[in-house]
Amino acid sequence: MNTLVIVLIAAVVLVCAYAFYGRWLAKTWGIDPNAKTPAVKFNDGKDYVPTNGWTVFSHQFSSIAGAGPVTGAIQAAAFGWLPVLLWVLIGGVFFGAVTDFGALYASVKNDGKSMGMLIEKYIGKLGRRLFLIFEWLFCCIVIAAFADMVAGTFNAYTVTDGVAALSDAATTNGAAGMVSIMFMVFAVVFGLIQKKFNFSGWKEAVLGIVFIVLSFVIGMNFPLVFNKATWSYITFVYIFFAAVLPMWLLKQPRDYMTTFMFIGMIAGAVVGLLVAHPTMNLPVFTGFNNASLGTMFPILFVTVACGAVSGFHSLVSSGTSSKTVENEKDMLKVGYGAMVLESMLAVLALCVAGAAASADGTPAAGTPFQIFSRGVAGFFEMFGVPVYVATVFMTMCVSALALTSLDAVARIGRMAFQELFSVDDMEHAEGWRKVLCNTYFSTIVTLAFGFLLTQIGYANIWPLFGSANQLLSALVLVTLCVFLKVTGRNNKMLFPPLIIMLCVTFTALVQRLIAMVKAIQAAASTTIPAGETTWGAVFIANGLQLIIAILLIVLGLTIVVNTFKSYVNSEKNSEKASA
């Protein structure tokens, strides 16, 4: 099938979903353009900052459009491109966008409270504590993984037999690294200029584009050739500042500039597919069971993840975006709009991978990021863009997909740690509680734990990320159901995605648990040849996953049970009130 047809179908579906279903949700739940948003009521110049709608949209989109939509869609294509396409469209429209919009809406209507605080208000304190612990650990794991990914992207060296040498991509990677650093520098300049002159519309856009061009010109002419360890240190220093500095000074302007770059990447992919209209070479459907991934249910849903629905998105919606929305009318494009655009990115990644596959359906060699990067860079080259420029641009885009999520999750992790130990009257808090809730202390603890995971092997627990992410989305849907019910709003549209996500999550966790038990049993009953592995290594890799899988199941069930009780109580209270 022609990839152009797939892109056009997806575009029509997603645009119609935003125009009709998204607006129906906004009308059903109730949007008040005259209401004071938390950003206006609690403007503190740091976390609560009134910001125009398109800037908040750029923050939301660049923060949620991480590695997931590209890697997930391409990896899940092992089941065939049609199941992936269907789930991205159905999941994006009725699951992901609804969850993101709902989380943003609930937070804005509750003074910018994060999801953990909403759980306390509508479900109970136990649910809040459990959720915040889960959220913080989740953020630390993402910090470790994405920081390692960013450092690896900029790394200019390869190590062979213990000897480091410059890689073939040293100049390209170094240039992308320098571009990224200039993005950070110009973001601060952008923020200061915006603070003084309050540019908007075309003036703001021109300023952002000028800084983007300058960043690439400087970066491509003065590449920074560092090893992975050095880039890792630089990355953690950056996300420390991104987590503690006021939103307007670094995070928002950098996200705004990055969104323009992402739009350029998406436009390049779309125009390339329009002009070349290559054939989708990946198979339509390969079966309900894949030898390497497992059964299509629930693995397809867990693997596609961010391209259709992601719990992490809700943390961004309720953690940062809700505190910067200037007017409630902007919530639709920020919450629902950013998600459907990410679903479009997942479709484009699928089509690029399909075009790169061989005629017999064999996937292209390399990681999903490499396949996508090479494919889009090839489209740019087709239009006369020099190979070096196209490669640096796509390397920067790939790193930015991870980096913009990384700085967001660092800030969210810091806030989760603070909320875990906070009380209502924090102004009079003293002693250990005041220290633990300090912005700088909580940031250092969060990043230190994330850095520790990069050193001791986060990969041992990373396979559970997909299930944990989907569990997060299920818990958010559970909370939104109670919120809408208690506040007298229609919540029926959440029941189908909630039930399906609970089934997906717990099935995936149970499958993982069984697989880990079998792996440990096999290792215990087998004599492992010397030099291959050890019992300790097997237990660390599988035993740790087993423990975490059990904890996730217990956590999920505990919150679901408490939510059910709260929901039943709200039903009884409403019946008494109407009697």
Predicted feature residues:
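Hydrophobic, membrane-embedded alpha-helices of multi-pass small-molecule transporters
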Residues: 52-68, 228-245, 257-259, 268-278, ...
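Transmembrane helix-loop junctions in multi-pass membrane proteins
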Residues: 2, 69-70, 82, 141-166, ...
